[in-house]
Amino acid sequence: KTGVIRFIGATEFSPGPWVGVELDKAGGKNDGSVSGVRYFACKPRFGSFVRPDKVKI
């Protein structure tokens, strides 16, 4: 999947670093928020959070 990095850092939903990605196509699990906490803004199902080692630039 491809997209734009919109967030890098710690989150409230899980320990450790995360990368928030706005996907080019729907297929994500969120809109940039998780459990009511907004990390970045995008359309529903276009947001995804992945571990940094899963990101290719």
Where are these regions (language model features)?
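Ser/Thr/Pro-rich, acidic low-complexity intrinsically disordered regulatory segments
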Residues: 1-57
